[in-house]
Amino acid sequence: MLGAMSQAIRFYAHGGPEVLRLEEAQQAKPAAHEVQVRHTAIGVNYIDVYDRTGLYPCNLPSGLGREAAGIITALGRGVRGLKVGERVAYVYSTPGAYSELRNVAAERVVKVPRGVSDEQAAALMLKGLTAHFLLRRTYRVARGDTILVHAAAGGVGLILCQWAKALGAKVIGVVGSEAKADIARKHGCKHVLISGRDALVSSVRTLTKDVGVTVVYDAVGKDTFMDSLDCIRRLGMMVSYGNASGPPPAISPLELTKRGSLYLTRPSLFNYIVSREELALGARELFAAVRAGKVKVVIGQKYPLSRAADAHRDLEGRRTTGSTVLVP
């Protein structure tokens, strides 16, 4: 059955930001075990760019966006433990969050606690849960570790750096400008390198007394991948979790052996939150870190939903810091 009218961003062909359209249509009522959420804030992420350009293929026409926060406006049959009017947030494996209303599976939403705003929650679900699994599950960062974080002033980067510092690690961040370097220093980085100015490998080797870092978190991809491998200590780990500059080059496993028997992984958030229990655990620890002041959510940009294309242009042009949020 059809319900209220809702505006949403859709696209009918892969391409640049210009393919995004704002449309209005009736939103179906929630099916069994679904809730309908009226969004108050929507997170913008690089995965949205991958969906739009076709790097991650999807059926067309398609919506866009994986994370949002808002208010429950309707419950489908069989929903338990949730009420109309409650504040919730979610991250979803299929796009469609760039909208005023959305129906989502009840088991995939989490309640937003007091002390966390809707905009913070929308900016945290994908980026914050990504930081959670990177730091607590892919490699369990602990006191004494030295880590290297690319895009340290970005949405995931700022959360990673703050949380890693709170865990006792020494953080070396890489950013694209002096302005971003200042932001990174204020959010957990002990040392900050500027890409294009500082030689990555020699700088890291100097800072670590030629030992190398325990783990590299690299969301940039092609432009930084090989140099990142040369920054890692013996038996260390390379975590390639994004392709902002393009996919990393293919390498032989022997390249890892030659550099000290390194570990290489390309993790995805959605493999870490398959079960309701995994999602709930990650959200609980993430919100606790925010409420305790260990992680401050930096929302650098806000746009109305109608300007989603501008948000993408700024994100791809590396003109953003922290998280970007759309407001319906």
Where does each model-flagged region fall?
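Short glycine-centered segments of the SAM/dcSAM-binding site in methyltransferase folds
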Residues: 87, 146, 170, 236-237, ...
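C-terminal hydrophobic helical "lid"/dimerization subdomain
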Residues: 276-328
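Mid-domain Rossmann-like dinucleotide-binding core that forms the NAD(H)/NADP(H) cofactor-binding site
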Residues: 124-198
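Glycine-rich phosphate-binding loop and adjacent beta-alpha segment
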Residues: 175, 223-294, 328
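NAD(P)H dinucleotide-binding glycine-rich loop of Rossmann-like/cofactor-binding domains
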Residues: 50, 89-153
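Glycine-rich beta-strand-centered segment in the early N-terminal region that forms part
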Residues: 26-43, 53-95
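Short amphipathic alpha-helix with an adjacent loop that forms part of the alpha/beta core around
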Residues: 199-210
